[in-house]
Amino acid sequence: MKLTCVLIVAVLILTACQVIAADSSCWFCSTGFNKCCESTGDCMTYPSEYNASCPEA
């Protein structure tokens, strides 16, 4: 039961991450909340220190 709960939580987190990444707004990236922003290609203007996954512009 615990494993099922962990799996459900993981799926929810991943889904939320994809939803945020699909948002064209870079606010999440600039504040460090969006760890998926590299997939949008929209947040490269921000320094990589905000998000280790975002390359420098």
Swiss-Prot record:
Expressed by the venom duct. Disulfide bonds join C26-C37, C29-C43, C36-C54. Keywords: Disulfide bond, Knottin, Neurotoxin, Secreted, Signal, Toxin. Residues 1-22 form the signal peptide. GO terms for cellular component: extracellular region. GO terms for molecular function: toxin activity. Coiled coil: none annotated. It comes from the Eukaryota. It is found in: Secreted. Probable neurotoxin. The cysteine framework is VI/VII (C-C-CC-C-C). Belongs to the conotoxin O1 superfamily. This is Conotoxin Cal6.34. It comes from Californiconus californicus (California cone).
